[in-house]
């Protein structure tokens, strides 16, 4: 999450590509001389082609796509000054806000999100990622 998603969009990237959606458990297919350490968002077992293993990129796609919609723009967010907390905020075309936060601390951290008119608090478990989406206050 840190390098692939939040780190890139926080540095003005307009999109994130997860190149390999599905590979087998030998990280194939691949080309000679190609990446030997790349993996798919999901791996499928080449013994039965039914068993699926969800890797970290699967969860990155799930978190972001659940709240950040096509055409969204990243907006400013400020607050938490903990080096083990990373987050990004977005405004979706339908006017909703999206917020994705990674807590890389061992312990739960209490956060408060505010859009300027209302706020809510949440306890973010240690070593977790949380995604939020809410309608703008009128």
Tell me the role of every PLM-derived stretch:
Residues 1-138:
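Substrate-binding and catalytic surfaces of secreted/luminal carbohydrate-active proteins
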């Amino acid at each position: 999450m840190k390098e692939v998603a939040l780190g890139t969009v926080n540095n003005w990237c307009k999109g994130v590509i997860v190149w390999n959606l599905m590979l087998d458990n030998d990280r194939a297919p691949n080309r000679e001389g190609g990446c030997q350490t790349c993996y798919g968002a999901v791996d499928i077992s080449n013994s039965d082609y039914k068993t699926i293993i969800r890797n970290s990129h699967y969860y990155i796609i799930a978190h972001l796509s659940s709240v950040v919609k096509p055409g969204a723009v990243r907006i400013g967010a400020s607050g938490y000054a903990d080096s083990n907390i990373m987050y990004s905020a977005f405004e979706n075309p339908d006017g909703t806000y999206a917020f994705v936060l990674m807590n890389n601390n061992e312990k739960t951290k209490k956060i408060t999100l505010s859009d300027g008119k209302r706020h809510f608090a949440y306890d973010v478990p240690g070593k977790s990622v949380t995604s939020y989406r809410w309608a703008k206050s009128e």
